[in-house]
Amino acid sequence: MTGWRALVLAAACVAAAGCASPQWQKPGAPLAAVEQALGRPTLVAPLANGGERLLYSRQPAGQQVYHLDFDAQRRLVSVTQVLTEARFQALRDGVDTRESVLATFGPPALVEHVARFDGDIWTYRLLENLTPRQAHVHIDPEGVVRRVMFTDEILGDFDPGR
């Protein structure tokens, strides 16, 4: 393949991938067209207005989770990237549950256990102000959120001796 053909093919692939990204879906798009472009969602949940929410997660490797909300006529109303510190900070200790966390953020990137907490720690990868971070949601054995903590995610060849 000649150089210019390879370049055209690469550009077409990039353009096609960009069109199939949740944030590029246009309001008013029919649900069937969005699902055809994006594939099967991670989760689907009913909305109070008779519509439904499609949740597309890029966890565990990615740092985004998108809510695509559709009205009762199955038309796209909004697209929201929900993996933000503000949304995790809005979780209410002792009130929010495993189910509400799952409905908001989708499945975690990692589920961990530590000696000092009797329950699961759900870890989500996110990007906050271009800084890779992790949100750790502590969920007790009854399925209730007890704490949310944040850590910076160290990526690549980190050398603490530098």
Describe the function of each predicted region.
Residues 1-8:
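Bacterial N-terminal signal peptides that target proteins for export
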